Every structure is written in C-alpha cells, then in structure tokens.
Amino acid sequence: MTGFRLADGGGPVIPNYGEPSACLRHNGWFCTDWIHEHWGDTLQPALIQHIQLTLIAVGIGFVIAFGLALVALRFGFLDPPLGVFTDFLYMIPSLALFQLLVPLSGLTVTTVEIALVSYTLFILYRNIVVGLRSVPPDVLESARGMGLTRRQTFLRVELPLAMPAILSGLRIAIVATISIATVAAFLIQDGLGAPIFDAIGTPDLFKTELLAAGGLAILLALTADLLLAFAQRALTPWNRLR
Amino acid sequence: MVASTFADAFRFMPSHFSLLLEKAAQTAELAFAALAIALLIALPLGLWLGHRHRGLLLALSASSLGRSLPSVVLIGLGIAILGVGFWNNAMALVVLAIAPILTNTYFAVEGVDSDAVEAARGMGLTETQILTRVELPLGLPLLLAGLRIAAVFVIATATIAGIFGGGGLGDIMARQVTYGLGGVFAAAIWVAGLALLTAAALALAQRAASRRTAPRA
C-alpha cells in the first residue's frame, strides 16, 4: 500500500543527484550524506507530522476519557460497561482498525486519528478513574467539613490527589501512541512510519533510511517519556519517594 | 457499511475456517515462542534484582525503553539483520515482551512486605528459600499480571509481522485486496479471541497458584 518513492529520492539509488556515495552503493547502516540530504525533505517533515499525530490523538483522547471518567464516577453503574468498551477498543489490532475505519472516513489523517484516539482511551480512562477513586473518603469528608463546595473539593482536593495516576496514564498513552502511529503509514504517507515503510519496502531494504527514521521514532518516544517523568516529579512534589 | 463488513466477517469465518485456524496457529506459535524466550531472560533477572532490592533504575528504564520501541521499527531492524522470517519477528517480540515481564517481576518481589521477609530470615530460611517460599508466592499476582500484559501485547503485535511477510493472522489483515474487509475484520476478531483466551488461561493459572500457596502463607 505504501508505494516506493523513487522520484524524490527515497531509495538508495539517486539518479539525479550525481554519483551516490560508496556508503549508499553498499547500502550501509548509517550514510550521513543521505541523512544530510534528506533531512529537510523526508525526515524532518515526517517527525513533525508524527508529533502532530500524537499530540492531537492524546489531546482528544484525554478530553473524551476525562469526560467518560466523570460520568462513570457520577453514575457508578456505567463504569463496568465503559471499562469493557475501552478494553474492547484496545484489543482490536491496529493494523485491522486502521483499515476498518477507511469505509467511514477514507484514506485520511482523520481515520488514523480516530484509531489512535480509541487506543488512548483504554489507558487514560482506567488511570483517571483509578486516580479519582483513590482519594480517601475521610479526606473528602474533611474537605466538606472545612466548608469547600463540591466544585472546590474537586479542583483543590480530588484532582491534585489523582494527579500521579493521571500523569502516569498520560505518559503511557503518549509513548504508546508514538509507537502505534508508525503503523499508520500502512494506510497513508504520514508520520515517521512513512519513511520506515519505504525503507523496508525498498528492494534490499534501505538500511540508512530505516535506521534514521526508526531512530527518530525511538528518540521521540524516549524524549517524551523522560519529559513526562520530570513533569510527574514537578507536579507531585509530595510523591517524590516513589 | 459497518453492518455489511460485520456480516462479511461472519461469513468469512466458516468459509475460511481452516485458513484462519492455520494462521492462528502461526500467530500463537510466534507469540508463545517469543514469550517463552522473554520469560527465560526476564524472570530470573527480575527475581534476582527484586530480591536484592537492587537495580531500580534498570527495572524502570527497561519499562521506559520497552514502551518506547515501536514494533514496526524493531521488526524492520530484525529483517535488516536476520532477513524475513520467523526469527526476526520472534526477536522483535522478545525485546517487546521483556520490558513488562522484567518490570512487574521486579516490583512483585521488591514490593513484598519487608516484615514478612525479615520474619522468614529470622526463622532461619536461606535466601533461596525466602525467594521461593515467601517472596514468589506473595508477589505472584503482580508477576502474573505482568505476564498477562506481555502476552496480550505480544499477540496483538505479532500481527504487525504480517505486513512484512511474517505469516499468521496479520497476513490476512495485511491483504485486504485478497481477503476483503470482511476477512480483515474476521482475522482481527480471531486475534482478539486468541488474546482473550491467553489472558483467561493466565488468570486461571494465577488463581490455581494462589490457592496452592494459600495454606502455606
């Protein structure tokens, strides 16, 4: 489904750019000349697309999951079916879900985003519900005793106490989405999956492109993981020991 | 549109039953081989580190790193190094499965109540006995939870191998042109079924294990 991009120099043979380097001719693991030449037209745009795919999916997923969690906490009987529903979404293999959505929304970024959002729901919904539910009843009792309104209790007591669970959910969701978004290139040329699929689809497998794009995907995930780990520490100073 | 795909999928299942069975067996073989190898590597390491209360950083970074490695990249690297086939896919899945098993095993053993461990030590149990008779039984639920996460994850990820000629149910999913959207959906349902069955089997094992250790605890 992902065509080979010969015209814009996606493969190891680059007829219009003069002699390929010795590294490229031998399909080396890390030909810096190719990376220099195609950073601007291949790698950087793919990286930016990938970040966009991830942020949009996790952003929308978070809003939906938060809403669902609030509904589940208010109406407890809805929690089991919502949990099963998000579990079920998570169990559909990404390769199939991307294709199943095509009749609904076509070969578009929207299709990819719907699939990615549905995967984030499982992680985010569970963590938000667990976090909000873990607030001890006597803490809520004393908040009420101090005269806080329901809204104040939620914003100043429940939400901060649920923060560790919510943040760890966000962290897992973002990293997982970065990983799953690479599969999206099976459908459309978008994100870091596109150069990865191109590289694997090239006869002989174009190693430099695979390693460069794959390495960027791994680096992006690791960076996000690290940043969110710091955010977790910064936002929950009372929780430093764990 | 959705309803007709659903109907197609349920027509596909009886008409292609032997194909689905064959592909499911391939997926199961690949996933279970990868899980077994990952267990052999991660279980002893996690038990030992957890027992010694060392290597927190290793356990945490293993889980971060494991989550951060996209399966497509790993399988691509596997193909680049080992060529298309069973072992490159198995290798990628082993790497992915090690992380949750190692992290959960570590925290399962490390998190056992230190009073219980001290009491066992005071009763004269050797370190090996403490590990096998106190820490392992008490940590077993968390350990098996890690195994369950790894199993479901590996089975779902094994389908990605189908894109690159790895066989299994992913093979059907990657060839919509041949099998139609109904076939893709049918294969997806079978993958979910396989994951559910494995998770259920591990849940049963967990219950059996905790029943066996209960009188001793």
Predicted regions, residues:
Chain A
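Short cytoplasmic-facing helical segments at TM-TM junctions of multi-pass membrane proteins
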Residues: 127-166, 196
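Loop-to-helix entry region at the N-terminal start of transmembrane alpha-helices
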Residues: 42-53, 102-123, 209-214
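Periplasmic/extracellular loop-to-transmembrane helix junction in inner-membrane transport proteins
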Residues: 3-57, 202-203
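Membrane-embedded alpha-helices of multi-pass transport/permease systems
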Residues: 63-68, 111-140, 163, 170-178, ...
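Transmembrane alpha-helices
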Residues: 55, 118, 150-184, 212, ...
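Hydrophobic alpha-helical transmembrane segments of polytopic membrane proteins
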Residues: 192-232
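Cytoplasmic-entry segments and transmembrane alpha-helices of multi-pass inner-membrane transporters
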Residues: 68-101, 126-130
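Short cytosolic juxtamembrane segments of multi-pass membrane proteins
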Residues: 232-242
